């Protein structure tokens, strides 16, 4: 068996694992209150923007009844979906950016263009993810936990892997 065939896969796994642990370490480092509060403002703003785009998708493509107030969606039956800073896809985007940095050599401008396209794909997927989770909450809340915790987390990394393959093979 040729070990060179496995090098790209080993590289992806290594980069994802190392960047995952780097994320965990850096996110656990205490920062000064001013930086923390500014970060809270930024992430809250991103949550509200994500909620607004989700609202547009839900109103345009579904018949789901809901009330949206800032970053919360309320559904009949007393169910709700709250868009928190963990929902804005920063970690998957971070993993994608790290993979691009450690990916194949390329013209910097080309890498930047693909990086921007990849981030746009991930952001749009996240809008669809939140929209789908809202539909699930409105239709069958018992499935929400599975899709939120397992399915979409896996789906994000499948998309990152597909983007990386597209980059490496282009």
Predicted regions and their residues:
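Hydrophobic N-terminal alpha-helices or hydrophobic patches in metabolic proteins across all domains
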Residues: 1-170
């Amino acid at each position: 068996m040729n070990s060179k065939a496995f090098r790209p896969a080993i590289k992806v796994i290594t980069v994802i694992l190392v960047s995952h642990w780097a994320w965990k370490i850096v996110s656990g480092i205490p920062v000064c209150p001013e930086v923390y509060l500014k970060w809270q403002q930024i992430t809250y703003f991103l949550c509200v923007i994500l909620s607004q785009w989700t609202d547009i998708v839900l109103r345009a493509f579904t018949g789901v009844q809901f009330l949206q107030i800032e970053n919360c969606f309320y559904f009949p039956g007393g169910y709700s979906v709250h868009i928190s800073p963990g929902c804005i896809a920063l970690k998957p985007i971070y993993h994608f950016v790290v993979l691009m940095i450690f990916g194949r050599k390329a013209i910097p401008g080309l890498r930047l263009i693909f990086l921007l396209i990849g981030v746009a794909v991930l952001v749009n997927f996240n809008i669809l993810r939140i929209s789908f989770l809202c539909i699930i909450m409105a239709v069958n809340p018992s499935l929400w936990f599975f899709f939120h915790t397992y399915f979409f987390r896996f789906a994000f990394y499948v998309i990152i892997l597909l983007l990386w393959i597209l980059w490496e093979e282009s």
